[in-house]
């Protein structure tokens, strides 16, 4: 079992990381050469960063923006419900539990929840003592970082998971625009991803990770792996690559990926820390930061997902909506984008920005993220707006530690497949599952140093 983190460890980690951050930087421009800029708004963006979290639906996390705050987006309106197995009605409600049980969200369960577009099978799919949780929604006080980012930048209220199924196929679509027909959490060997394509084009890219890099466990790609600690120093020095995917801590006592039943307060602290590091980076003015989730995790959403053109049978059906915010110095402020998007939209954006050939027809057809950019801020020479200062996340470590002591068992790990797959292919220095708590302590220390987190 991983060692639990303490407030002292967070503070000690902060001293060490602060000293490292004080070292001279190597420059203030992203790695990757002087490629030709395309015309249009994307030509003003040099650096793309994606933080993909785990297993939450749009209504579950951001639906209350409309229901309780009146925000003009496609959220909850009140009266949403599903039937329980006994025929009783379960209405949507405010969920007070930060660590709910993990609802089913595999291929078959997700399709049962969808039920041909009725979206009425969520409670039945999670039948049992915790079945009502899937109709629960969180509010601003529980998700302070996400809600402030949604206030400050562009919320995408029609960003769908790429697959109506679990984590791996959806993350494959972020990386490669396909899972090659894989419906479950299993490796796809030989997958050609955006990392391969950027490497061949001489454009820098990295998979920053806490305990495990998905690229390594998912399809055995081990080039460009960088530890999350290096992300903070790279951001401060202006040395982030052209494209980065940030993987949260998937396992152990430091898990901060938002996958149930991991504590969502650690997820808020991670988001705040990443945003603060990016906002303070010399690269912020020409950056696009995408915060999204891989899939809905079995939680209710009222929007029936659409279909697209796809060569693999069954994969033309998109998954449920996931919470997504696009941030950056040139992004529209306080906006809502309702264009149909999915994880492959990230690849479409990179393809058009860097003049790449689309990885496949799905990437070629996907809508890119250019509409998130403010036309007034993408004209050459225009001054960008400063980053929003996010209120620090108050993190009660004592409460988190108490919960882990009460819960942790070896068979509780929701990412067992990824951990086992990574163990088979990763060099020892990149397999850090046993260090999960210490790694997250170092990330929290960075967040505290940047003023994004207060540990108590």
What residues fall within each predicted segment?
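N-terminal pro-sequences and low-complexity stem/linker regions of secreted or lumenal proteins
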Residues: 2-5, 9-456
């Amino acid at each position: 079992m991983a060692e639990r983190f303490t407030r002292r460890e967070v503070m000690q980690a902060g001293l060490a990381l602060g000293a490292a951050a004080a070292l001279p930087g190597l420059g203030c421009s992203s790695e990757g050469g002087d490629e030709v800029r395309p015309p249009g708004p994307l030509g003003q963006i040099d650096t793309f960063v994606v933080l993909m979290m785990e297993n939450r639906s749009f209504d579950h996390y951001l639906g209350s923006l409309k229901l309780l705050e009146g925000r003009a987006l496609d959220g909850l309106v009140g009266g949403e419900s599903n039937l329980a197995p006994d025929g009783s009605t379960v209405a949507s409600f405010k969920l007070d539990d930060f660590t709910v049980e993990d609802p089913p969200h595999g291929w078959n369960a997700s399709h049962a929840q969808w039920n041909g577009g009725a979206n009425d099978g969520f409670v039945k799919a999670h039948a049992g003592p915790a079945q009502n949780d899937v109709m629960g929604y969180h509010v601003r006080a529980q998700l302070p970082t996400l809600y402030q980012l949604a206030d400050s930048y562009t919320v995408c209220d029609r960003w769908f998971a790429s697959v109506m199924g679990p984590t791996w196929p959806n993350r494959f679509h972020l990386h490669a625009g396909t899972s090659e027909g894989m419906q479950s959490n299993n490796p796809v060997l030989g997958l050609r991803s955006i990392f391969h394509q950027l490497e061949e084009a001489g454009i820098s890219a990295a998979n920053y990770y806490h305990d495990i890099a998905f690229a390594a466990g998912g399809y055995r790609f081990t080039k460009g792996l960088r530890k999350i600690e290096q992300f903070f120093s790279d951001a401060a020095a202006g040395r982030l690559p052209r494209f980065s995917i940030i993987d949260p801590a998937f396992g152990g006592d430091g898990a901060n990926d938002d996958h149930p039943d991991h504590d969502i307060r650690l997820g808020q602290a991670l988001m705040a820390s990443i945003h603060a590091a990016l906002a303070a980076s010399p690269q912020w003015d020409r950056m696009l930061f995408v915060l999204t989730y891989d899939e809905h995790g079995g939680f209710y959403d009222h929007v029936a997902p659409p279909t697209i053109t796809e060569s693999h049978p069954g994969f033309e059906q998109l998954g449920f909506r996931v919470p997504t915010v696009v941030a950056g110095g040139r992004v529209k402020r306080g906006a809502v984008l309702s264009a149909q998007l999915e994880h492959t939209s990230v690849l479409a954006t990179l393809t058009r920005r860097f003049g790449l050939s689309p990885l496949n027809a799905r990437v070629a057809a996907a809508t890119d993220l250019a509409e998130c950019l403010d036309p007034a801020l993408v004209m050459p020479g225009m001054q960008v707006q400063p980053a929003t200062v996010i209120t620090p996340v108050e993190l009660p470590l004592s409460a988190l530690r108490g919960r882990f002591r009460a819960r942790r068992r070896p068979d509780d790990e929701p990412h067992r497949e990824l951990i086992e797959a990574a163990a088979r292919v990763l060099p020892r220095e990149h397999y850090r599952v046993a260090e999960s708590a210490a790694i997250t302590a170092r990330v929290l220390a960075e967040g505290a140093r940047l003023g994004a987190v207060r540990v108590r």
